[in-house]
């Protein structure tokens, strides 16, 4: 039984350098042969490439793909900002990563928690397995590995630090990165241009802070805001 959820997190979590990972992705799009990684076997190459393709390089449409690739291949964002962009992209591309982030990491961050550990991820995965046994037919050892690798990913993305119990790191979202985030969320889920867009939850802002940020005069070049009571519709502008 294959199940609905993939184990891509386990492969991606084993990659030592995410800066090189971004270079590898850019090189794939430039059709270069030198990946920057050294693999022991062809099987390892195939496993790695498959995890990148299915766990990162999945897109809603061509606009979404172009937005991501241009952001990681250009010089507009720092490496730390590109890590956050990669974090958001993995949320879209990998269903299990999205569920762990939505139900474990983001609640801890929004609650102002200082630390997070693999046991929390494992507890959630066990619960998910009970709710969807056919979708997650994994052994306990695989669940445990996934919970651990998930925290490894967060650490390499700059969102956590430490060894066993990870310290939660709150990223700095610059205005430029915020503009990218809004464009990404509305491009990844184009049918929902309201604050109920499911991807807006991952922006590190509570609802009131998000509204205030959206309405900043500096952002009028990028979108229009239409408000009816407590409902807000975001209309992206073509500014490039």
List each model region and its residues.
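Amphipathic alpha-helical interaction surfaces
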Residues: 107, 127-131, 153-160
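Short helix/loop segment immediately N-terminal to the Walker
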Residues: 132-142
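Acyl-donor binding region in acyl/amide transferases
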Residues: 110
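Eukaryotic partner-binding/assembly regions in large regulatory complexes
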Residues: 1-107, 116
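Short amphipathic alpha-helical interaction segments
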Residues: 43-48, 96, 140-156, 203-216
């Amino acid at each position: 039984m294959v199940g609905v959820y993939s184990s891509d997190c386990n492969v991606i979590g084993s990659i030592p350098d995410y800066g090189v990972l971004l270079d590898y992705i850019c090189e794939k799009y430039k059709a270069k042969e030198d990946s920057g990684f050294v693999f022991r076997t062809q099987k390892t190459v195939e496993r790695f490439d498959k995890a990148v393709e299915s766990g990162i390089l999945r897109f809603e449409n061509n606009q979404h793909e172009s937005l991501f690739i241009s952001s990681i291949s250009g010089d507009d964002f720092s490496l730390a900002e590109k890590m956050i962009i990669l974090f958001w992209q993995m949320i879209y591309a990998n269903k299990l990563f999205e569920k762990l982030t939505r139900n474990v990491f983001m609640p801890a961050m929004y609650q102002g928690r200082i630390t997070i550990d693999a046991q929390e991820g494992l507890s959630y995965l066990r619960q998910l397995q009970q709710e969807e046994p056919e979708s997650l037919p994994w052994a306990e050892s695989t669940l445990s590995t996934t919970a651990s690798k998930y925290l490894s990913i967060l650490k390499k993305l700059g969102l956590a630090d430490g060894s066993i119990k990870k310290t939660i790191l709150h990223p700095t979202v610059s205005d430029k990165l915020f503009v990218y985030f809004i464009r990404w969320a509305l491009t990844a889920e184009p049918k929902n241009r309201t604050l109920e867009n499911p991807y807006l939850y991952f922006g590190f802002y509570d609802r009131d802070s998000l509204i205030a940020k959206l309405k900043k005069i500096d952002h009028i070049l990028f979108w229009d805001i239409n408000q009816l009571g407590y409902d807000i519709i975001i209309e992206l502008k073509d500014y490039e």
